[in-house]
């Protein structure tokens, strides 16, 4: 029997066929369902992009209104889930809370697997996806209140997806400029082809388990430091630098020790990350109009971006989406440990689109392995072992 090919991390292995998103890493291009990400960020909304990812076409007015109404109507989280959250340690990371809370939603799902009829019912799958997308921001915002001893703030059906989340975080009317920033960030983080968390969606979904298990697994995967969390690391890095005057020495030390500079470079993009280009322009525009608080950390970030680009730009290493989203979230007053849960809120749309695509032509994942262990060993009773 021929030895199977071994590709560590499945790098370069096409594990699926997909029509959801596409990346041209050499040209620095990203598209959702064939639409350039720059056009979607400029003209669309997260609600519309989520439905585009799920259904494959730009929705008409009636379909978009139906989906948007459904999102607003399903923001409330069952009281039992809130009770579960009460017993979680407030010192835990919000991603651990989100993983647990989303998994608990599956307790209210009547079946542990999808029937043939359900898998073929587009409206049914849309409804399940809509409920998850609607409730994840509520869970994150509830936790932000509960971990500081406050009662959760009820969602408002008169607000958009992004605006409602900002309202539930603070209890204040959301700033329109901040709402636009968050909406754009949600669009830019909504989908990015097959990465670790999306691959976990395919593997878990291929078993025909319910979508709460599928998304719970993806959240757990995203929580790993090699996948999600980079924008939180960006803010921690900027706080460590502490002043504009220290930027050069910090970068020199990191480069001399061949250590990672958070928020720079990308495994796929060989030029500028198109999402980063959009967010940088937005950051500059918002700052010039006084819509960001312009903290000392913001000034450090601008200098890090300038000096790091001078040192690394010729190698094709530029600031990525995590660098700018981390800075923008910080300037909006959002705590750093909420950055990855917000990433998960956005990516839920892409995850669920891939879940649906997997169900449409399902085959359970069963890769092989290259065995490297010993053979034909003889069992020795414990009394005779030396």
From Swiss-Prot:
Pathway: Carbohydrate metabolism; tricarboxylic acid cycle; isocitrate from oxaloacetate: step 1/2
Family: Belongs to the citrate synthase family.
Protein's UniProt keywords contain Transmembrane helix: no
Catalytic residues as annotated in Swiss-Prot or TrEMBL: 266, 322
Swiss-Prot/TrEMBL catalytic activity: oxaloacetate + acetyl-CoA + H2O = citrate + CoA + H(+)
GO terms, biological process: carbohydrate metabolic process; tricarboxylic acid cycle
Keyword terms, alphabetized: Transferase, Tricarboxylic acid cycle
Annotated EC: 2.3.3.16
MF terms (GO), sorted A to Z: citrate (Si)-synthase activity
A GO cellular component annotation in the UniProt record: cytosol
Additional record remark: Citrate synthase is found in nearly all cells capable of oxidative metabolism.
EC top class, as a word: transferase
Keyword Ion transport: no
Lineage: Bacteria, Pseudomonadati, Pseudomonadota, Acidithiobacillia, Acidithiobacillales
UniProt-listed SUPFAM superfamilies: Citrate synthase (SSF48256)
InterPro entries given in the database record: 2-MeCitrate/Citrate_synth_II, Citrate_synth-like_lrg_a-sub, Citrate_synth-like_sm_a-sub, Citrate_synthase, Citrate_synthase_AS, Citrate_synthase_bac-typ, Citrate_synthase_sf
Protein's UniProt name: Citrate synthase
Gene3D superfamilies in the cross-refs: Citrate Synthase, domain 1, Cytochrome P450-Terp, domain 2
Superkingdom assignment: Bacteria
